[in-house]
Structure formats: structure tokens, C-alpha cells
From Swiss-Prot:
The name this protein goes by in its record: 2,3-bisphosphoglycerate-dependent phosphoglycerate mutase
GO function terms (MF aspect): phosphoglycerate mutase activity
Pathway this chain belongs to: Carbohydrate degradation; glycolysis; pyruvate from D-glyceraldehyde 3-phosphate: step 3/5
Cited function: Catalyzes the interconversion of 2-phosphoglycerate and 3-phosphoglycerate.
Family that this chain belongs to: Belongs to the phosphoglycerate mutase family. BPG-dependent PGAM subfamily.
Alphabetic keyword roster: Gluconeogenesis, Glycolysis, Isomerase
Active-site feature positions: H9 (tele-phosphohistidine intermediate), E87 (proton donor/acceptor)
GO biological process, any: gluconeogenesis
Pfam families for the chain: His_Phos_1
Enzyme class label: isomerase
Amino acid sequence: MKKLVLLRHGESVWNRENRFTGWTDVGLSEKGIEEAISAGRTLKEEGFVFDVAYTSVLKRAIKTLWLVLEEMDLMWIPEYRHWRLNERHYGALQGLNKAETAERHGMEQVMIWRRSYDIPPPPLTPDDQRFPGSDPRYASLLPEELPLTESLKDTVARFLPYWHETIAPAVKEGKRVLVTAHGNSLRALVKYLDLVSDSEIVNLNIPTGIPLVYELTDNMTPIRSYYLGDPDDVARASRMVADQIKK
């Protein structure tokens, strides 16, 4: 049996302010720092050890990974960062308050933008300062790889090549793998692993800072998955994610 641990970064400053974040590189809030440290402590207490870790190129995920590994005394293990693990790009919504956007466009429309599978938010224009083409961390990307907006379907298509080429082979080799990423990049992976339908994915919310453990067969079929946390706390945190468009 193989094990894989997924972790959404701790609460970010923009999570706290209830803004659409996407590829905007914002840091962790004080609560987010505490969540990351707590996740590391829980993983250590439950006997988890990792051989390798993967994360995005956004500092809220990187910092979460560092805090987890520091708490586990595993700062020395190899860690790899890749843009394909980034959060879904929220296009022209990035930086906007979710509840205020729902008031302006209607809760149903914003829910479609946030949680539907194949409908992206309104796109940026290439001259928008939020467009990642001017960011040096993406200088090696092809023009067609730089998003103006993304649906979850787009995020799945972006994420899965790195999963198949890099992360999944490490798990198959027997390495103990930690992936610290984002709500929607992890939703993309969970959708793939659990064969979640396009219509059901709207109901899947991943809370910040709570480790999600997958037990997998040798051919990477899930046996079961579970959060390392009190079920009531996990349910409450998931509801908070779902309710972000409400005041």
C-alpha cells in the first residue's frame, strides 16, 4: 500500500480578507502560520515521515511546506516547486472580495465561476498587471502556458502532466510524498484520483491547513482517503470555504 499526503496551504492574508487570490503571490496570515505548524505537529504525532515534497511557486504554499517540515524536523528532504501546482488562475476576479462580487453579479453566477468544472471567470487582458507574463518566475513558460483565466477543467489539464511525470512515479517507487498546494489544484487531483464527476465537483471544498491522507494500491487506485483532524472541525472548515461568497 502507498500513502500520499495532500495539504492545502494555511490561511493566506487574502483568504482572511475573503478575496479571490489565484496566482497573486500573497503570504500567510497569522492564523495560516499557526495552521501550518499545527499540520506539521499532527503529521509528526501520527507517525508520518516524508522522503520528498512538492509545492507550487507561490509563497503561501512554499511557506506552509517549510513550516510543516520544520515542525517535523525534515527540512533536509528534497523539495520541488513547479508552476503546474499553482492555484487556479481567477482571471479578472483576482483581488476582488468574494461577497462583494456576489452582490454585484449574483451569488449563482459567482458560484459558477468558483466551483463549476468548465466555466472560467472573466479573463484578464495581456496588458493587465495581474497577467503572469511579466513575472520572472514564469519566464521559461511558453506564451500558450500563461493563463488569462482558468476553469477547474483548465487546472486539471495543467496539473495532471506534472502528476503523471513526476509525483505519481515517486509514489509508485515507494517514496513517502507530501504535496503542499492550493484549494483548486488539490481539487483537480482529488477529482482525478476519486473519479469525481463534473457535476459533483462543485460540492468539494478543501479546507486550509488540514492534511488529507490517501492510501493507494500499487497501481495508484485509492483505497480510502481521510483528513487528519476532528471530523467536526474538518466539516466546519469545509463549510467556511463554501460560504465565502456570503456576507
